């Protein structure tokens, strides 16, 4: 069917060995097939943490093309995904320079980064940049534009547009695999008729 990529929801619910076997089988068909997922579990799982395909264990895949979404990039650029008022680097929060450096190198180990100051990760969780999915928004949660509005209501329209551009520039110029929600480039909003904003992915305007 010429499917060229596979995304795993809550990839951390899968064990490392299973993910390795999937990658091996995909490589037999076409080594350029993308394979990535959410590097978290979404809650409790009976799977031992050391065997879980979570973000922190991506290093256990060696140089295999298995990537995880970088919440380090997402939240350092725009602010915490679940805190509408919290700002990130592009919308005015200071002290995130090391986190942005970490984004730029695709979550790999490089000199010149103080990993103790990275927003979530205290070490490089990717061996290669292609194991890191750099993104700022996806189908879940608020759009980037809505987040920028809610966290910077006093900023001008032009200033928020510039924040949106800077966010895109960080994703596009960083090492790793860039990922965008459709519409992020034209300031997509999920505004409800009553003026509130919708964060879900199944009932959005």
Describe the residue ranges of each PLM region.
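Alpha-helical structural signal in soluble globular domains
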Residues: 18-29
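Conserved alpha/beta catalytic core and glycan-binding cleft of carbohydrate-active enzymes
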Residues: 23, 32-187, 191-193, 197-198
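Short, intrinsically disordered, charge-balanced linker/junction segments flanking boundaries
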Residues: 201-205
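Short, glycine/acidic-rich beta->alpha junctions
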Residues: 14-18, 160-163
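Active-site groove signature of glycoside hydrolases
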Residues: 1-14
